[in-house]
């Protein structure tokens, strides 16, 4: 099992110096906190797994990691954006479905 939490960053933040070490540390801590419940469930089941907090565009990063790790499937939550948010932000799940080579299962 490979679990990732992807903290969305924009390339222009890097270029503009807006993502300093303090900001990246905060994002990593947020990702660790966000993944705590999922890790607890997998721990309780006695399964082994890898967990990492990554940075970038979530859909692209998830699809890339799945390919690099030769995952046979992807299971991810469907956050449920409002129509307006979806229009402006897009859907991570939709992007993963488009890019991933493995089957994608969405959990509500």
Spell out what each predicted region is.
Residues 11-15, 73, 98-108:
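Intrinsically disordered or low-complexity boundary/linker segments at protein termini
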Residues 13-16, 63-64, 86-87:
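Short, well-ordered secondary-structure micro-motifs
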Residues 1-17, 41-50:
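Small/aliphatic-rich secondary-structure junction motif
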Residues 5-8, 77-79, 108:
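Short secondary-structure boundary segments
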Residues 20-33:
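A short acidic, glycine-rich active-site loop
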Residues 30, 53-57, 79:
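Short beta->alpha linker loops
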Residues 76-98:
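Glycine-rich, Arg-bearing micro-motifs that act as flexible, cationic patches
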Residues 40-74:
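Structural beta-alpha unit
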